Swiss-Prot record:
PROSITE patterns per the UniProt record, alphabetical: RIBOSOMAL_S14 (PS00527)
Keywords: Ribonucleoprotein, Ribosomal protein, RNA-binding, rRNA-binding
GO term, biological process aspect, one: translation
Gene3D superfamilies: 1.10.287.1480
Descriptive protein name: Small ribosomal subunit protein uS14
Subunit and interaction comment: Part of the 30S ribosomal subunit. Contacts proteins S3 and S10.
Family: Belongs to the universal ribosomal protein uS14 family.
A GO molecular-function descriptor: structural constituent of ribosome
Summary of the function given for this chain in its UniProt record: Binds 16S rRNA, required for the assembly of 30S particles and may also be responsible for determining the conformation of the 16S rRNA at the A site.
Gene encoding the protein: rpsN
A single Gene Ontology CC term: small ribosomal subunit
Pfam families attached to this UniProt entry: Ribosomal_S14
Amino acid sequence: MAKKSAVNRNERVKKLVKQYAAKREALKAIANDESLPLEERFEARLKLAELPRNSAAVRIRNRCEVTGRPRAYYRKLKMSRVSLRELGSHGLIPGLVKSSW
């Protein structure tokens, strides 16, 4: 199991990302629009820099839903390889069959 503090921190980051997503997207659109004057684009970049760091989507860490493990994460299943193997061997994941050849 991952530390609860690390899992909770990641949840707080997810919440911040969701909260600032629209504002961040609007500022990025202004900053990248080459038809606007340079000063206006620069202002948008400054406002973007003033937003909280944790409001950027790249700060989110994919974590296992079962254990909170941050590494060896399968995106489709939202779990780590360890949890996948454990739950799969008990037959708790629908459609997952042990390979044999």
